[in-house]
Regions:
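Conserved ABC transporter NBD signature motif
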Residues: 57-68
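Conserved ABC ATPase signature
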Residues: 143-148, 152
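A short, proline-enriched helix->beta-strand linker immediately N-terminal to the Walker B motif
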Residues: 163-167
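Helical segment within the ABC ATPase nucleotide-binding domain
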Residues: 184-197, 209
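A short, surface-exposed alpha-helical micro-motif characterized by mixed small hydrophobic
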Residues: 211-213
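ABC ATPase "signature
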Residues: 229-230
Length: 262
């Protein structure tokens, strides 16, 4: 199992905001963490990545290919991020530096983790921009984040996250800030890239309809605890918890299941 989370806790001061969360992500699996705002899903992801805010402390176990990540030194975690584990945030401005070109930022990830030359990094940046369907990739890599649309910025952030071909992608509500049409395009892009590269995926969302488009299994959280774990098809047709039933009622996007989704 590539990622195994066991009894994960997150404490902020005396308050426990993630309480005993456990789930696994086998190689190549697509697993969704779903819950309302404040359910602990994003903090769970940040704990896995070693990116918790100041004052928050993680406990329990997070094992990546058998290696324990809880308590791992920051330098070693930073090496894993971007190399073995890619990250896409809800708001691409979180990932993109406003005073650096898109190409420099995509290429910088490759230079840091693979040690390539500046010329090779720029070539790779153009390749990755094309891979995420950014228009006119040879020119767009010379632009700054503010010169791109919201959907284009998210594509650029995805290109950065996947430039080094990580084995696991963690995507934290990457489509929430986008309109419905662009949201669908980004979901289809992510699904295609994950399948093409054989990556594992942890996808975080509050929308069961969105989850149904990209994940095969779901972990439902409420108040920091797991209340249900099941295939997404089961969550949609036979939810076992009141929380999941509420998420199903609240789903507003069109439910669509790609061919072959189990």
């Amino acid at each position: 199992m590539s990622l195994e989370v066991t009894d994960l806790t997150v404490d902020i001061g005396e308050r426990r905001v993630v309480d005993g969360v456990s789930f696994g992500v086998p190689d190549g699996a697509r697993v969704g963490l779903i819950g309302e705002s404040g359910s602990g899903k994003s903090l769970t992801a940040l704990a896995i990545l070693g990116l918790l805010p100041d004052g928050a402390e993680a406990g329990g176990s997070v094992r990546w290919n058998g290696r324990e990540l809880i308590g791992l030194p920051d330098r070693e975690l930073a090496t894993l991020r971007g190399d073995e584990i890619g990250i896409v945030f809800q708001e691409p401005r979180t990932a993109l530096n406003p005073i650096r070109t898109i190409g420099r930022q995509i290429g910088e990830s490759v230079r840091i983790h693979e040690g390539v030359s500046r010329g090779e990094a720029r070539r790779r940046a153009v390749t990755e921009a094309a891979r995420v369907a950014l228009p006119d990739p040879g020119r767009i890599v010379a632009r700054y984040p503010h010169q791109l649309s919201g959907g284009q910025r998210q594509r650029a952030a995805i290109a950065m996250a996947l430039a080094c071909r990580p084995r696991l992608l963690i995507a934290d509500e990457p489509t929430t800030a986008l309109d419905v049409t662009i949201q669908s395009e980004i979901l289809e892009l992510l699904l295609s890239l994950v399948e093409d590269d054989g990556m594992s995926l942890v996808f975080i969302t509050h929308d069961l309809a969105v989850l149904s488009q990209i994940a095969t299994h779901g972990v439902v959280l409420d108040e920091g605890r797991v209340v249900e774990t099941a295939p997404v098809s089961t969550l949609l047709t036979a939810p076992a918890s009141d929380v999941t039933r509420g998420l199903l009622r609240d789903a507003t996007a069109t439910l669509w299941r790609p061919e072959g989704l189990a």
